[in-house]
Amino acid sequence: MLALKISVYTVVFFFVGIFLFGFLASDPTRTPNRKDLESPQD
């Protein structure tokens, strides 16, 4: 039972990590204007 929980948590965290990483990585690409908002001095 413990091994089952470990494998389930591993798979869940694996997919969640990929989802968050892909979302954060594609977020600035979809909104290039955000760079101007983050650095208005430029």
From Swiss-Prot:
Parts of the chain that traverse the membrane: 6-26
Assembly and interaction partners: PSII is composed of 1 copy each of membrane proteins PsbA, PsbB, PsbC, PsbD, PsbE, PsbF, PsbH, PsbI, PsbJ, PsbK, PsbL, PsbM, PsbT, PsbX, PsbY, Psb30/Ycf12, peripheral proteins PsbO, CyanoQ (PsbQ), PsbU, PsbV and a large number of cofactors. It forms dimeric complexes.
InterPro entries: PSII_PsbI, PSII_PsbI_sf
Membrane disposition: Single-pass membrane protein
Domain of life: Bacteria
Cellular component annotations (GO), alphabetically ordered: photosystem II reaction center; plasma membrane-derived thylakoid membrane
Name of the protein in question: Photosystem II reaction center protein I
UniProt keyword Glycosyltransferase, yes or no: no
Species, as recorded: Prochlorococcus marinus (strain NATL2A)
Subcellular location field: Cellular thylakoid membrane
Pfam families according to UniProt: PsbI (PF02532)
Function: One of the components of the core complex of photosystem II (PSII), required for its stability and/or assembly. PSII is a light-driven water:plastoquinone oxidoreductase that uses light energy to abstract electrons from H(2)O, generating O(2) and a proton gradient subsequently used for ATP formation. It consists of a core antenna complex that captures photons, and an electron transfer chain that converts photonic excitation into a charge separation.
Keyword Transmembrane annotated: yes
Keywords: Membrane, Photosynthesis, Photosystem II, Reaction center, Thylakoid, Transmembrane, Transmembrane helix
GO BP field: photosynthesis
Family statement: Belongs to the PsbI family.
